[in-house]
Amino acid sequence: MAITKKCFAAFVLILLFVMPFVYCSELDNTSGFEIKQEDKCYGPEPCKNGYEGCLFFCVRIAYYLYGECTMKPDHQKHCCCVTK
């Protein structure tokens, strides 16, 4: 079964036209101008060592981008880690 040049060219053009739409449909529902980040807060223990303790906790234990100590309603600083 021989594939002619016209059939091959049509197949390649269809692939080039369809592939961008398949790739774009797999992305999340962001507008393109924002990065989806999520915070996850843990107890106050990592913040007892200051900012560096929270940062070390988030990177080493939880594998997040970074961490920061934030004041919560219970008037204690909790270690909140930010994900991608």
UniProtKB/Swiss-Prot annotation:
The entry's keywords: Antimicrobial, Disulfide bond, Fungicide, Plant defense, Secreted, Signal
Coiled-coil ranges from the UniProt annotation: none
Record has Mitochondrion as a keyword: no
GO biological process: defense response to fungus; killing of cells of another organism
Broad class of the protein's primary localization: secreted
Subcellular location: Secreted
Keyword field contains NAD: no
Signal sequence extent: 1-24
GO cellular component, one term: extracellular region
Top-level taxon in the UniProt lineage: Eukaryota
Residue pairs linked by disulfide bridges in the UniProt entry: C41-C81, C47-C69, C54-C79, C58-C80
Family statement drawn from the similarity comment of this UniProt entry: Belongs to the DEFL family.
Protein's name according to its UniProt entry: Putative defensin-like protein 114
